[in-house]
């Protein structure tokens, strides 16, 4: 901060936004960081607009309780920058890269600005390697691509955060790479729980966490994903690592952008969102990619307002994703978790030349049976199962077993469910569903397939329920 020369004064304050008067010849650049010092406390702002006559409009990255007109504002001469490199691992940061875990201050470290250009087309690298998650419904029907972007779509309370936490647990412990978690506009309690869960699981030393929670100003929530991405990019570009970037929740990034847009006086677009929605989303998503040096695989939870998948916020996110995992309230209501809707979800990796012919055919047969089961729902509701043809009765019975078998006990939920978490190998998943489709287990009670990892466990559960092979 010794290089600060440019000094302005606050001329207007409205919530988390301030107008600052600078000398005409020394106006700070757009995206520059400004600093206000009050009683040994430093508040950082980011320049968003030039209003003319030396006045700039800036957005706060922290609360603005003690501000008053006339206070001095210092132009730092650079963008907001965050620490990068191995020192950020096992630590928790805010949007400015300041540690918030109560640990010791960082020693000497490198800082990178949070705004950067996306890798050029020539720098990017296409890959078709599958990232095994150990979660049956995902590995079978919606396989994730290493270096791809994955979206977890769902309304409130259907299990997005739990699924993200399970993916962190499974991939970080099995994959062995580095992870960066961005908590964007979600609950502080969830961030706290995640930190201690990761510490307990022994994966914290390979993870950096960055939080801009729902109680923070929109500026912090809008920029925290960029702060986390900057840390991930350093590991990819300078350490040649394969990095996992988890964002919970990408909708809050859009929501914060909408709040900031309104504060800046922009005319809203469709459903009240900012007119720059597609641009802002693109600037973030285009930086999340694989290059010739390393990869970033991104898993993003996407809140769906009022369960409306056509809402502009989730719809804009859709176009950037390689796999779409849709969580359904109806499936959650049946007590089946993860509440993934296999018919609404999709992945561009589900191709025979990527996953193999057997995997592809088994997945397609599973989807066909579930689709036919869905078509029969209205008939069943009106006339009952007894009025169906024998072939349709078989479809219904098999589909119910498949639906139950797509459930799975999670490691991160075992303290609540009392059921040991399961990591299932992808080959076991494919073989188990192949046997299930063949009708080999049509005589086993459908309840036995709920919350088990493999067919063998389902058989054990059935025997405990009083079923025997003579039945």
Curated annotation (Swiss-Prot):
Predominant subcellular localization, coarse grouping: membrane
The protein's enzyme class: translocase
Keywords: ATP synthesis, ATP-binding, Cell membrane, CF(1), Hydrogen ion transport, Ion transport, Membrane, Nucleotide-binding, Translocase, Transport
InterPro entries, per database record: AAA+_ATPase, ATP-synt_VA_C, ATP_synth_F1_bsu, ATPase_a/bsu_AS, ATPase_alpha/beta_chains, ATPase_F1/V1/A1_a/bsu_N, ATPase_F1/V1/A1_a/bsu_N_sf, ATPase_F1/V1/A1_a/bsu_nucl-bd
Catalytic activity: ATP + H2O + 4 H(+)(in) = ADP + phosphate + 5 H(+)(out)
GO CC annotation: plasma membrane; proton-transporting ATP synthase complex
Keyword set includes ATP-binding: yes
Binding site for ATP: 154-161
EC number from the UniProt entry: 7.1.2.2
Localization of this protein: Cell membrane
Membrane topology label: Peripheral membrane protein
GO molecular function, one term: ATP binding
Family to which this protein belongs: Belongs to the ATPase alpha/beta chains family.
Subunit structure: F-type ATPases have 2 components, CF(1) - the catalytic core - and CF(0) - the membrane proton channel. CF(1) has five subunits: alpha(3), beta(3), gamma(1), delta(1), epsilon(1). CF(0) has three main subunits: a(1), b(2) and c(9-12). The alpha and beta chains form an alternating ring which encloses part of the gamma chain. CF(1) is attached to CF(0) by a central stalk formed by the gamma and epsilon chains, while a peripheral stalk is formed by the delta and b chains.
Function, as annotated: Produces ATP from ADP in the presence of a proton gradient across the membrane. The catalytic sites are hosted primarily by the beta subunits.
Name of this protein: ATP synthase subunit beta
Organism per entry: Mesomycoplasma hyopneumoniae (strain J / ATCC 25934 / NCTC 10110)
Source organism phylogeny: Bacteria, Bacillati, Mycoplasmatota, Mycoplasmoidales, Metamycoplasmataceae
The encoding gene: atpD
